[in-house]
C-alpha cells in the first residue's frame, strides 16, 4: 500500500498539471495519429501502464475495489470502444489519466480543464462502477428530464462530456466537478439556452459559405422561423408565420438567384414589409414575382440550375403549369392531330387534374361546369387570368396584393401560383369549355376577360381579401369549381398558390399540404413530361405561371382552336389578322418558348388549328391581347420582351416555352392595363377594339421581333414576318412596357418586359425588367430616342440599355453581321448611347459577378469583374445570359438609379450593392487567408523536388493575384466611370426627383463609395500579397544564377502573364516592351479611343470610352470583346471586332495590365509581347485577332471622328485630359511595377547567392 499511496500522492500532485498535460498529449496523439499501427503500439504500452497505475492509484481511493474492477473490465470495454473508434491510444492514455482523474475528482473535485476528450471521458465514465453507471443512467434520465423541463438541452454537454454510455451532464457531475460554465448554466446563471451562434465557432460566420447560394444568416433565420411556424402553440398565427417564412425564403432565394442571373430583384428588399405592401404595393409583388419567374427563366436559359430551380422552385408553380404544361407538353409531344391533342388534352387534363387533387376537382368541376359555365368559368378563369392580365391596377392592387401576399408570402411561387392557377384553371376551364364550347371560350374569352374583369376583380379582391385566410383554406376549399366563377378562379388561383407554395415551401409553409401532395404528384408528372420536353419543360416549370396561362390555354385550344378560329373569325374577323399576328406573336413566343412544333402551329396562326395548344394559347393570348390592347404599347412592349424572351429561350433551347408564357403574361399584364382602362366595360367590344389596335401594334411588334426571329421560322406566315419586319423598321422596335405589371398573372411578364431582343441575330439582351426592347438595326436611333422619351415619360425607372455588344451569346456571331449592318446604318450603336456598356457591364459585374464570387476562386471573381460579368464559363451561352441579365440590371440601377428608386424600392439596388460589399469583404477575408508560400527556407525550397513541384501552384496564385488586382483596379475604374455617367444623368433629372428618390440616390452613392473603398482596400491587400508572393517566388525561382533555367522558365512563363518578369535576366526585355506598349497606349488612348467614345453621348461616352480605354489599353483581364462591350459598340461593329468577341466568348483572357495586345491595337504588331508568353501563350493565337479587332475599332473611331459635333469636341478635350491622366497613371503604375521587378530581380539574384550558400550550409 505504501507504493500505491505514494503513487497516488504523486498522482494527486501531478493531476492538475501533469495529468492534464499528459491527457492533452494523449488526445493530441489520438487526434493526430489515426494510424492503427502507431496508436495500437502506444495504446498497448499505455494500457499496461495505465492498468498498473489505475490499480495503484485507485487503491488509496475509497473506490479501490471498484477501481480495480474498472481497471480491468471497464478498461477493456473502453479499449474495445476506442478501438472501434480507432483511437486505442486515446483509450489507453485516457484510461491512464482517467483512473487517476477519477480518484482525484472523487477526492479533490479537481477540474480537468477543458481538454477532456470523448475518449478520455468515455474511459473515465466507463471506469465508474457499474452500479454507479446504473444509478447514473437512472439519474441521467431524470435529470435529463429536469434539464429539458428547464429548457436546457443536454445534447452539447452530453455529447461533449460523455462517451455514449453516459447520457447526461448530471451523471458526469456526480463523477467530477463540471465545467464552471456548465455549472453556472445549470445554476440558472446566464441564458438557459445559449445562443446557437455562441456554440458555433466564429470561423463559420466570419466568411460566407463557399457553397452556392448559402447564407448562414438567412438559413438560421429561416430555421428559426420554421421552428416558430411548426410550433403547434402558434396555431393560427403559424399559418401567417409560414407566409412570412415563405416570403423570407423566397426573398432570399430570389436575391441569390438574382445574383446568379444578374437580374434585378426590385422588391426583394421590401419583402419583409410586403405583407403591408402587398395590397398597397402591388408593384413590388410584380417585381418579386417577375423576378422569381425571371430568375427561373434566366436560370433555365443560363442552364445554371435549370433542373433545380425550375423543378425545385418552379415545381410549385408547375402544378397549374403542370396542368397546362402536361397538357400542352403531352399535347405537343403526344398529339399529332388537333383532335388527338384535344382528346389527349382532355385526358391529360383529367389526369393532371386528378394528379392535382384540388385542381382536379376544380378542373373537372370547372370542365363540367365549364360546359355549362364554360363562358362564366372561362370568363372567371380568363377574368382571373385577364383580371390578372387585364385589370392591371385592380389586379395589381387586388391580385398583386393577393398575389403579392402570396408571392411575398409564398415567395415568388404564390404570385406565380395565382397567375398560374388562374392561367391553369383558366386553361383547364378553357380546355373543358373549349372542348365543349370552344367558340364560346374564344369569343367570350375576349369579351369575358373585360366583362369578367370587374367580377374577377371582385373575385380577385375576395381572393386577395380572403387569401391569407384562404391561403390556408385554399387547400381546404377545393370546391372552387362551385358555380361561382369567382370561387373557381379564386380557389384555383389560391390552390395554385398553395400548391406552388406547398411544392416550393411545403416544409415550412404547410399551406396546402393536400394541394402540395397533388402538386408534388402533378408536379412530378409534369416535370417528367417537361423533362421529356427537355429544357423547355424546365423553362415551363419556371414559367409555369405564364405557361399555365399560355400552355394550359393552348392545351384546351387544341380542341378549342378550330372553334376559336371559327369564333375568332366570327367575332374577330376584322381582328383575325391582327389576332393571328398577335397570336402568331404569342404563338411565336409561345412556340418559341414551348416548342418549335408549337411554333409551327403558332406560325400557322391563321390556321391556328394546326397546333391546338399553341393556337389556343395564341388565341387566348390574342384575347388577352385584345383585352390588353388598350395597353397595347405595354403589351407590345411586353410581347416584344416576351418575344425577346422567346428568342432567348429559343436560342437557349426551349426557354422559348417560357418566353411565350411570358408573352402571355405580358399580354395579361397589358390586358390588366386595358382592363383597367376598360375595367367597367363589358369588354367584348372594348376587347375587340383593343384587339384591333393591339393586334396592329402586336403585328408591328411582331414585325420588329420577327426581324430578330426571322431565322427562327417561329411564324411561318410570311405576312406576319413581313409586317413585323416592317413594323420593326417602322419604329416599334423599342417599346417600354409599364414597370412591372401586376404580379398575379405573370411575374414572367415582367421578365418579358425585362428581356430585350437586340438584333436579327437572335441575340437577346435582358434589359431592366420594366422595359421591352425591340431592337432593330435601323431603328436603334429611334429606339434611343423613344427609350429616352419612355424613360422620361414612363414611371418605369429602369433605363433601356440596348447594347447588342453586351449580348454575349454563341449566336452573337450570327447577329454580328446584322449588327455590323446596323453600325453601318450610319448611326452609332445605340447601345453605347443608351447605356454605356461599361456602366452596364461594370454594374453587371457588380451584381452578377459578385453573386458568383463565393462560387469561384477570388482570382476568378476579379477576372469576371474585369470582364464585365463574362464569367470564365466554358459555355458561351451561360456567359451570354449572365451578361445580358446582369447588365440590364446594372443598367437600370446604374444609369437611372433615380428611376429605379422611384418605381422599385431602392432595397433591390441596395441589396445588390450591399451584396457586393459583402462579397468584397469576404474576398478581403479570403485574401487574408489566401495561401502564401510556406516553407522554412524559400530560397532553398527550389532545390527540393517537392517545392519545385508546388512552385507552379504558387506561380498560378501569383498570376491570379496580379490578375485580380488589375481586375479590381479596372473594376473600380469602371465603377467610377459608371458613377460619373450616373451623376451626369442624374443631374438632368435630379431637380425632378422626389425627396425619397434623392435620399435613395444619396444612399446608393454612399453604398457605391463604400464598394469602391472596399475594392481599393482589396487592391491594396492584393498588392501586398503580390509583393510577398513575388518575393517568395523570386527567392524560390532564382536561388542562384547557376540554377538551371528550367525552373526559372517554368516559373517565369507562368508569371509572364503578370507584369512581373520571370527573372531579372528577362527584366530589360519586358521593360522595353512595356515602354513600347505605353507609347502605343498613349497614342491610341489619347486619340483613337477618346475619339471613339465621343460619338457616345458625353455623359455616357466619356465613361464608356474612358473605361474602355483603360480596360482595352491596360487589357486588364479583358479580351477584345471586353472592349467592345465596354464601348457598347456592337460586337460586329467591325469585322475585326466581330472576330474578337468570338474569341472572348471562347476564352477569357487573363493578361497583365498593359502587356496584353488586347489594347486598342498596335497597328503594326500582332505579336504578343514576350512577357505574354506565359499564360498568354494559349491566347497568343487569339491575341492577333484581338489586336486587329481593337485596331479596327480604333480606326473606326477615327473614321467617325469627323462627324462629332462641336460640343462633343469640347467634351473630347475633357476626355482627352482624362485619358491623359489615365495614361499617366498607367505609366506610373507600370514603371513602378517595372522598378519593383528590377529590384526584386536584383534581390532575387542576391538572395540566390545567399540561397546557394545556405544550401551548401544545409547540405
Curated annotation (Swiss-Prot):
One of its GO terms (molecular function) is signaling receptor binding. It is found in: Cytoplasm. A 33 kDa peptide corresponding to the C-terminus of this protein is found in the testis and seems to be cleaved into 2 peptides of 14 kDa and 18 kDa found on the surface of mature sperm cells. This sperm surface antigen may be involved in some step of early cleavage of the fertilized oocyte. PANTHER family: PROTEIN ITPRID2, SPERM SPECIFIC ANTIGEN 2-RELATED. The keyword Phosphoprotein applies. Residues 268-277, 382-393, 1101-1118, 1158-1168 have a biased composition (Polar residues). Residues 959-1037 form a coiled coil. Residues 31-72, 268-290, 306-450, 806-829, 1094-1137, 1154-1215 are annotated as: Disordered. The gene is ITPRID2. Strongly expressed in pancreas and testis. Present in colon cancer cells (at protein level). The modification Phosphoserine is found at residues 92, 111, 209, 270, 330, 466, 644, 668, 737, 739, 746, 759, 767, 803, 869, 902, 1040, 1055, 1060, 1063, 1118, 1134, 1161. It comes from the Eukaryota. It holds the Pfam family SSFA2_C. This is Protein ITPRID2. Signal peptide: none annotated. Induction: Up-regulated by activated KRAS. Keywords: Actin-binding, Coiled coil, Cytoplasm, Isopeptide bond, Phosphoprotein, Ubl conjugation.
Amino acid at each position: 500500500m505504501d507504493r500505491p499511496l505514494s503513487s497516488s500522492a504523486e498522482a494527486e500532485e501531478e493531476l492538475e498539471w501533469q495529468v492534464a498535460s499528459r491527457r492533452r498529449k494523449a488526445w493530441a496523439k489520438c487526434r493526430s495519429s489515426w494510424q492503427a499501427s502507431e496508436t495500437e503500439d502506444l495504446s498497448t504500452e499505455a494500457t499496461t501502464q495505465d492498468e498498473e497505475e489505475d490499480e495503484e492509484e485507485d487503491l488509496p481511493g475509497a473506490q479501490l475495489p471498484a477501481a480495480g474492477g474498472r481497471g480491468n473490465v471497464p478498461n477493456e470495454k473502453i479499449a474495445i470502444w476506442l478501438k472501434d473508434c480507432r483511437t486505442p491510444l486515446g483509450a489507453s492514455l485516457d484510461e491512464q489519466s482517467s483512473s487517476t482523474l477519477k480518484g482525484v475528482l472523487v477526492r479533490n473535485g479537481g477540474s480537468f480543464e477543458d481538454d477532456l476528450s470523448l475518449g478520455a471521458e468515455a474511459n473515465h465514465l466507463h471506469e465508474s462502477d457499474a452500479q454507479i453507471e446504473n444509478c447514473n443512467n437512472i439519474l441521467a434520465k431524470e435529470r435529463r428530464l429536469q434539464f429539458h423541463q428547464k429548457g436546457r438541452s443536454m445534447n452539447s454537454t452530453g455529447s461533449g462530456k460523455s462517451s455514449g454510455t453516459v447520457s447526461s451532464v448530471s451523471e458526469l457531475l456526480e463523477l467530477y466537478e463540471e465545467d464552471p460554465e456548465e455549472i453556472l448554466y445549470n445554476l440558472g446563471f446566464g441564458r438557459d439556452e445559449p445562443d446557437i451562434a455562441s456554440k458555433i465557432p466564429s470561423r463559420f460566420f466570419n466568411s460566407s459559405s463557399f457553397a452556392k447560394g448559402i447564407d448562414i444568416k438567412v438559413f438560421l433565420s429561416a430555421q428559426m422561423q420554421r421552428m416558430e411556424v411548426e410550433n403547434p402553440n402558434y396555431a393560427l398565427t403559424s399559418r401567417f408565420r409560414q407566409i412570412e417564412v415563405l416570403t423570407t425564403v423566397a426573398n432570399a432565394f430570389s436575391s441569390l438567384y438574382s445574383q446568379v442571373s444578374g437580374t434585378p430583384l426590385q422588391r426583394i428588399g421590401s419583402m419583409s414589409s410586403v405583407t403591408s405592401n402587398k395590397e398597397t404595393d402591388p408593384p413590388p409583388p410584380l417585381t418579386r414575382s417577375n423576378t422569381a419567374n425571371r430568375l427561373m427563366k434566366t436560370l433555365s436559359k443560363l442552364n445554371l440550375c435549370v433542373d433545380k430551380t425550375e423543378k425545385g422552385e418552379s415545381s410549385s408553380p408547375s402544378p397549374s403549369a403542370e396542368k397546362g404544361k402536361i397538357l400542352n407538353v403531352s399535347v405537343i409531344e403526344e398529339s399529332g392531330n388537333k383532335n388527338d391533342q384535344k382528346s389527349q388534352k382532355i385526358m391529360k387534363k383529367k389526369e393532371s387534374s386528378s394528379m392535382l387533387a384540388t385542381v382536379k376537382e376544380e378542373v373537372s368541376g370547372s370542365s363540367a361546369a365549364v360546359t355549362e359555365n364554360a363562358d362564366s368559368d372561362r370568363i372567371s378563369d380568363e377574368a382571373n387570368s385577364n383580371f390578372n392580365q387585364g385589370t392591371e391596377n385592380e389586379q395589381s392592387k387586388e391580385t398583386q396584393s393577393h398575389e403579392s401576399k402570396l408571392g411575398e408570402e409564398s415567395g415568388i411561387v404564390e404570385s406565380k401560383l395565382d397567375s398560374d392557377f388562374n392561367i391553369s384553371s383558366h386553361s383547364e376551364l378553357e380546355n373543358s369549355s373549349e372542348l365543349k364550347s370552344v367558340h364560346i371560350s374564344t369569343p367570350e374569352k375576349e369579351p369575358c376577360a373585360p366583362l369578367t374583369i370587374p367580377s374577377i376583380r371582385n373575385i380577385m379582391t375576395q381572393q386577395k381579401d380572403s387569401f391569407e385566410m384562404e391561403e390556408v383554406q385554399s387547400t381546404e376549399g377545393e370546391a372552387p369549381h362551385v358555380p361561382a366563377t369567382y370561387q373557381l378562379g379564386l380557389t384555383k388561383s389560391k390552390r395554385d398558390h398553395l400548391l406552388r407554395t406547398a411544392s416550393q415551401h411545403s416544409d415550412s409553409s404547410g399551406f396546402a399540404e393536400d394541394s402540395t401532395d397533388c402538386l408534388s404528384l402533378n408536379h412530378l408528372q409534369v416535370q417528367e413530361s417537361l423533362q421529356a420536353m427537355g429544357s423547355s419543360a424546365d423553362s415551363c416549370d419556371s414559367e409555369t405561371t405564364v405557361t399555365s396561362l399560355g400552355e394550359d390555354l393552348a392545351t384546351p385550344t387544341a380542341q378549342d382552336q378550330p372553334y376559336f378560329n371559327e369564333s375568332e373569325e366570327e367575332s374577330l374577323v376584322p381582328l383575325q389578322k391582327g389576332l393571328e399576328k398577335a397570336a402568331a406573336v404569342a404563338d411565336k413566343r409561345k412556340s418559341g418558348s414551348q416548342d418549335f412544333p408549337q411554333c409551327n402551329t403558332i406560325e400557322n396562326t391563321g390556321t391556328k388549328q394546326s397546333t391546338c395548344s399553341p393556337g389556343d394559347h395564341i388565341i387566348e393570348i390574342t384575347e388577352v391581347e385584345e383585352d390588353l390592347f388598350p395597353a397595347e404599347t405595354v403589351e407590345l412592349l411586353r410581347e416584344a420582351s416576351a418575344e425577346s424572351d422567346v428568342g432567348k429561350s429559343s436560342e437557349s433551347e426551349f426557354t422559348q416555352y417560357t418566353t411565350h408564357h411570358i408573352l402571355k403574361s405580358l399580354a395579361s399584364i397589358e390586358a390588366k392595363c386595358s382592363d383597367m382602362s376598360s375595367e367597367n366595360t363589358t369588354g367584348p367590344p372594348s376587347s375587340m377594339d383593343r384587339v384591333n389596335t393591339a393586334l396592329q401594334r402586336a403585328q408591328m411588334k411582331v414585325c420588329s421581333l420577327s426581324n430578330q426571329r426571322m431565322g427562327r421560322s417561329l411564324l411561318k406566315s410570311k405576312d406576319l414576318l413581313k409586317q413585323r419586319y416592317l413594323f420593326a423598321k417602322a419604329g416599334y422596335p423599342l417599346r417600354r412596357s409599364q414597370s412591372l405589371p401586376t404580379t398575379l398573372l405573370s411575374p414572367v411578364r415582367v421578365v418579358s418586359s425585362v428581356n430585350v431582343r437586340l438584333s436579327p441575330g437572335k441575340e437577346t439582351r435582358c434589359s431592366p425588367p420594366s422595359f421591352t426592347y425591340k431592337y432593330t438595326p435601323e431603328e436603334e436611333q429611334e429606339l434611343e430616342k423613344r427609350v429616352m422619351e419612355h424613360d422620361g415619360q414612363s414611371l418605369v425607372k429602369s433605363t433601356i440599355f440596348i447594347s447588342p455588344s453586351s449580348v454575349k451569346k454563341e449566336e452573337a456571331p450570327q447577329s454580328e453581321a446584322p449588327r455590323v449592318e446596323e453600325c453601318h446604318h450610319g448611326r452609332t450603336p445605340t447601345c453605347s448611347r443608351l447605356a454605356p456598356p461599361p456602366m452596364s457591364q461594370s454594374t453587371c459585374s457588380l451584381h452578377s459577378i459578385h453573386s458568383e464570387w463565393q462560387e469561384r476562386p477570388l482570382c476568378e471573381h476579379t477576372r469576371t469583374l474585369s470582364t464585365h460579368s463574362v464569367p470564365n464559363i466554358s459555355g458561351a451561352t451561360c456567359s451570354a445570359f449572365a451578361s445580358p441579365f446582369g447588365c440590364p440590371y446594372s443598367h437600370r440601377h446604374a444609369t437611372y438609379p433615380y428611376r429605379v428608386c422611384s418605381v422599385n424600392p431602392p432595397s433591390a439596388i441596395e441589396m445588390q450593392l450591399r451584396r457586393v460589399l459583402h462579397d468584397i469583404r469576404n474576398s478581403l477575408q479570403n485574401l487574408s487567408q489566401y495561401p502564401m508560400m510556406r516553407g522554412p527556407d524559400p530560397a532553398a525550397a527550389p532545390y527540393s523536388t517537392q517545392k519545385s513541384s508546388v512552385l507552379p501552384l504558387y506561380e498560378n496564385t501569383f498570376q491570379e493575384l496580379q490578375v485580380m488586382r488589375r481586375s479590381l483596379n479596372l473594376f473600380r475604374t469602371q465603377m467610377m466611370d459608371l458613377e460619373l455617367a450616373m451623376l451626369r444623368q442624374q443631374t438632368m433629372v435630379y431637380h425632378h426627383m422626389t425627396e425619397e428618390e434623392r435620399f435613395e440616390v444619396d444612399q446608393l452613392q454612399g453604398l457605391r463609395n463604400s464598394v469602391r473603398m472596399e475594392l481599393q482596400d482589396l487592391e491594396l491587400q492584393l498588392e501586398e500579397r503580390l509583393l510577398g508572393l513575388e518575393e517568395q517566388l523570386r527567392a524560390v525561382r532564382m536561388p542562384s544564377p547557376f540554377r538551371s533555367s528550367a525552373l526559372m522558365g517554368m516559373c517565369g512563363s507562368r508569371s509572364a502573364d503578370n507584369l512581373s518578369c520571370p527573372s531579372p535576366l528577362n527584366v530589360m526585355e519586358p521593360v522595353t516592351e512595356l515602354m513600347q506598349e505605353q507609347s502605343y497606349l498613349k497614342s491610341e488612348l489619347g486619340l483613337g479611343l477618346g475619339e471613339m467614345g465621343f460619338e457616345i453621348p458625353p455623359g455616357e461616352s466619356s465613361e464608356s470610352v474612358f473605361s474602355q480605354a483603360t480596360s482595352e489599353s491596360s487589357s486588364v483581364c479583358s479580351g477584345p470583346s471586353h472592349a467592345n462591350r465596354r464601348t457598347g459598340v456592337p460586337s460586329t461593329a467591325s469585322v475585326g471586332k466581330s472576330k474578337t468577341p468570338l474569341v472572348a466568348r471562347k476564352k477569357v483572357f487573363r493578361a497583365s495590365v498593359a502587356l496584353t495586345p488586347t489594347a486598342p491595337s498596335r497597328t503594326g504588331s500582332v505579336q504578343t509581347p514576350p512577357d505574354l508568353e506565359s499564360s498568354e501563350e494559349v491566347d497568343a493565337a487569339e491575341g492577333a485577332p484581338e489586336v486587329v479587332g481593337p485596331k479596327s475599332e480604333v480606326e473606326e473611331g477615327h473614321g467617325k471622328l469627323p462627324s462629332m459635333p462641336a460640343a462633343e469636341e469640347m467634351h473630347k478635350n475633357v476626355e482627352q485630359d482624362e485619358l491623359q491622366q489615365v495614361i499617366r497613371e498607367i505609366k506610373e503604375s507600370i514603371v513602378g511595377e517595372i522598378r519593383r521587378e528590377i529590384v526584386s530581380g536584383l534581390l532575387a539574384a542576391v538572395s540566390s547567392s545567399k540561397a546557394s550558400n545556405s544550401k551548401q550550409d544545409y547540405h
